[in-house]
Amino acid sequence: MASTQNIVEEVQKMLDTYDTNKDGEITKAEAVEYFKGKKAFNPERSAIYLFQVYDKDNDGKITIKELAGDIDFDKALKEYKEKQAKSKQQEAEVEEDIEAFILRHNKDDNTDITKDELIQGFKETGAKDPEKSANFILTEMDTNKDGTITVKELRVYYQKVQKLLNPDQ
């Protein structure tokens, strides 16, 4: 883990190097270019994290004042790591939800779930109207409207649910 001094030096270097118009502000585009230069795995995501930590007024720019103000770098790093841990936990929850859904409804051990499998699953769980429940699920999850639900469609659906439950993430 980098020391606070290293972080301060890196931020100053970033300002000196990538504040292209020398206005004392870093835009998201400048940050993305910075991380590309550093050969970051995902420069856009790195820029987003940078802005989540340092763009205190959420105006889409990181200013020298925001960087040099009352920033507690250790606290900022801790918050960043907590957000990362929460994000990983949410990803794990999505995968658990997908697995549970597949186990409950997939009757022929392939990866797609059909309307008939949904109906059968709802019958087994005692749903009042299994066909209506199946139709609702297909309407919500079957994005390509082919009559089956794929793992990809499940993942997209459960990620949307996570975002609704955790809008600040």
UniProtKB/Swiss-Prot annotation:
Binding site for Ca(2+) 3: D108, N110, D112, E117
Residues holding Ca(2+) 4: D142, N144, D146, T148, E153
Positions of Ca(2+) 2 binding: D55, D57, D59, K61, E66
Single GO molecular function: calcium ion binding
Protein origin, superkingdom: Eukaryota
Keyword Transmembrane: no
Domain EF-hand: 6-41, 42-77, 93-128, 129-164
This protein's UniProt keywords: Calcium, Metal-binding, Repeat
GO terms for biological process, alphabetical: adenylate cyclase-activating G protein-coupled cAMP receptor signaling pathway; cellular response to starvation; oscillatory cAMP signaling
Regions crossing the membrane: none
Positions with a binding annotation for Ca(2+) 1: D19, N21, D23, E25, E30
InterPro entries assigned: EF-hand-dom_pair, EF_Hand_1_Ca_BS, EF_hand_dom
Function: May be involved in the phase-shift of cells from growth to differentiation.
Protein name, per record: Calfumirin-1
Gene designation per UniProt: cafA
